[in-house]
Amino acid sequence: MLVHVPNVLTPAEIALCRARLEAGEWIDGRATAGQQAARAKHNLQIPEDSDTARELGELILRALGRSPLFNAAALPLRVLPPLFNRYDVGMSFRNHVDGAVRAIPGAGMRLRADVSTTLFLTDPDAYEGGELVIEDTFGSHAVKLPAGDMIVYPATSLHRVEPITRGSRWSAFFWSQSMVKDDGRRALLFDLDQGITGVRRKLSDDDPAAIALTSCYHNLLRRWAEM
């Protein structure tokens, strides 16, 4: 399940992120990759323990809290602090699957990466190439979104970033451990959630149909959630 979440950041927040990243220190992105992924990865990253990463990561986590669509799609139990990457001309990240388990910095605990998320910080007309290509059973999906928009997809997905041929592509990325680790079940709950939202727009909240659907949603979540 791929979900496009628009307008996660405001224009002012995007401008702040860009200003901080412009002034930040960029390092070889392979420093944070596993052995296999490091051979496929060619980009730059902001050090995850830097003041810039912490400040902007907290900004993004606050923005996620006000995004019902992200929370409906990911059903997050834990969210890893966001990281920040940059692809300049000639840079890319060949096909790979994200690692299954991630350490949460400073928390002394680990997170199962169920859901991957990329938040775009550069508008599409600022660069050429650089599409995030996600493979699933329906084929390949090339994603290139406006700054401030986000794509949410299963961390089990084979994916890549195409080579940049002009300009520079900046983004934040992070992983979530979901309360519902199975993507098929998450997709069913997401569809049901969106259906309930549509029903509630047309009917009152105390309409029997709205109550019945909401009850089904919560009872399925109760059955499948792992806390």
Swiss-Prot record:
UniProt remark on cofactor binding: Binds 1 Fe(2+) ion per subunit.
Cofactors: Fe(2+); L-ascorbate
EC number: 1.14.11.-
GO molecular function list: 2-oxoglutarate-dependent dioxygenase activity; iron ion binding; L-ascorbic acid binding
InterPro entries xref list: Oxoglu/Fe-dep_dioxygenase_dom, PKHD_C, PKHD_hydroxylase, Pro_4_hyd_alph, Pro_4_hyd_alph_FE2OG_OXY
Keyword hit for Lyase: no
Sequence positions that bind Fe cation: 96, 98, 159
Gene3D superfamilies per the UniProt record, alphabetical: q2cbj1_9rhob like domain, Rabenosyn, Rab binding domain
Domain Fe2OG dioxygenase span(s) in chain numbering: 78-178
Record GO biological process: DNA damage response; intracellular iron ion homeostasis
Broadest EC class assigned to this enzyme: oxidoreductase
Keyword annotations of the record: Dioxygenase, Iron, Metal-binding, Oxidoreductase, Vitamin C
Keyword Ribosomal protein among UniProt keywords: no
Chain residues that bind 2-oxoglutarate: 169
One Pfam family linked to the record: 2OG-FeII_Oxy_3
Protein name per UniProt: PKHD-type hydroxylase Mnod_1077
